[in-house]
Structure formats: structure tokens, C-alpha cells
Amino acid sequence: MPLIYMNIMLAFTISLLGMLVYRSHLMSSLLCLEGMMLSLFIMATLMTLNTHSLLANIVPIAMLVFAACEAAVGLALLVSISNTYGLDYVHNLNLLQC
């Protein structure tokens, strides 16, 4: 396995570990999720460039579109939660609390 792939897998693993460790705040969870999506996007782009397939060129673009949609929904949720509660804790997202 080349060194660039190991670095990208390490970036994904660090982002996943950050998502597991810092899951109390929504902003840190969103940043870790963006890091995971960025590393997956770079990995998909490198795989597409190495296979020289024209049909696989749409995969990184579709991942980028989904990452942008995820970021927009996450930021809208962050603004909504912070305006309602004044904090960005993830436990405020539970709708079953009284």
C-alpha cells in the first residue's frame, strides 16, 4: 500500500476517533464528519485517477455533493439548536425530553 493511501486512511481514522471522543458538542462532531468526508473524497478521487475509468469519474463528484448537503443541513441544525437552547450540545437534539 503506497504511503499516500496510508496517510488518507490515517486522516479518516483520526476523524472517526475525534467523532467518537468529542461527541458532546455538535460543532466538533460536524467538523470531524467533514474531515471524514474529505478523506473519503480524496481516496475516491485517487482511486478514480488510478483506474483510468470514465464511468467512475462521477463518484467523487457525487460524494462532494452529498458532503455539501450534509454540511448545509448540519449548519442549519446547529443554528437552530443554538438559537433555541443557547448551547450546541448533542443531547439537546433528543425530541423526547420534557
Swiss-Prot record:
It catalyses: a ubiquinone + NADH + 5 H(+)(in) = a ubiquinol + NAD(+) + 4 H(+)(out). It is linked to Leber hereditary optic neuropathy: A maternally inherited form of Leber hereditary optic neuropathy, a mitochondrial disease resulting in bilateral painless loss of central vision due to selective degeneration of the retinal ganglion cells and their axons. The disorder shows incomplete penetrance and male predominance. Cardiac conduction defects and neurological defects have also been described in some LHON patients. LHON results from primary mitochondrial DNA mutations affecting the respiratory chain complexes. The gene is MT-ND4L. It is a multi-pass membrane protein. It is found in: Mitochondrion inner membrane. GO terms for cellular component: mitochondrial inner membrane; mitochondrion; respiratory chain complex I. This is NADH-ubiquinone oxidoreductase chain 4L. Keywords: Disease variant, Electron transport, Leber hereditary optic neuropathy, Membrane, Mitochondrion, Mitochondrion inner membrane, NAD, Primary mitochondrial disease, Respiratory chain, Translocase, Transmembrane, Transmembrane helix, Transport, Ubiquinone. GO terms for molecular function: NADH dehydrogenase (ubiquinone) activity. Coiled coil: none annotated. Its EC number is 7.1.1.2. Belongs to the complex I subunit 4L family.
